[in-house]
Amino acid sequence: MKKIDIKILDPRVGNEFPLPTYATEGSAGLDLRACLDHAVELQPGQTTLLPTGLAIHIGDSALAAVILPRSGLGHKHGIVLGNLVGLIDSDYQGQLMVSVWNRGQQPFTIEPGERIAQMVFVPVVQAEFNLVEDFTDSERGTGGFGHSGRQ
């Protein structure tokens, strides 16, 4: 298992609010919690930035982290990420903040310590472009945006 440096910025993390952990042996994501002093009510269409009380430094350019929505919040309540996916570069060292967006029809209250998103570590390949005049033909070619049909 890869070790990642984490800094607790809010003393409630690890005490009142659990540290991020994998829920099961097969879990890909670690839950991130809203490190709030009081509940926040999100009106329909509203976005806000929520602190997690944590900072990470991945420190390995072959890794990054992505912040993803929690499926239950999105499906049941319309609460998704304001930027859809958050990307944490390996050299970032600041607090993890989560942009949440209420795309639902009802106000939604986020409580202090509530699980609001999940973080997944992913491998990174930094590409070097090779300038060419043409590509070698492929079966797909330039077809895109539904060219292969729906069935």
Curated annotation (Swiss-Prot):
One GO biological process term: dUMP biosynthetic process
EC number(s) recorded for this UniProt protein: 3.6.1.23
Ligand binding (substrate): 70-72, 83, 87-89, 97
Annotated InterPro entries: dUTPase (IPR008181), dUTPase-like (IPR029054), dUTPase-like_sf (IPR036157), dUTPase_trimeric (IPR033704)
SUPFAM superfamilies in alphabetical order: dUTPase-like
Pfam families hit by this protein: dUTPase
Pathway it works in: Pyrimidine metabolism; dUMP biosynthesis; dUMP from dCTP (dUTP route): step 2/2
GO molecular-function terms, A-Z: dUTP diphosphatase activity; magnesium ion binding
Record keywords, A-Z: Hydrolase, Magnesium, Metal-binding, Nucleotide metabolism
Cofactor: Mg(2+)
Enzyme class: hydrolase
Reactions this protein catalyses: dUTP + H2O = dUMP + diphosphate + H(+)
Cited function: This enzyme is involved in nucleotide metabolism: it produces dUMP, the immediate precursor of thymidine nucleotides and it decreases the intracellular concentration of dUTP so that uracil cannot be incorporated into DNA.
Family: Belongs to the dUTPase family.
Protein name: Deoxyuridine 5'-triphosphate nucleotidohydrolase
Organism, scientific name: Yersinia pestis
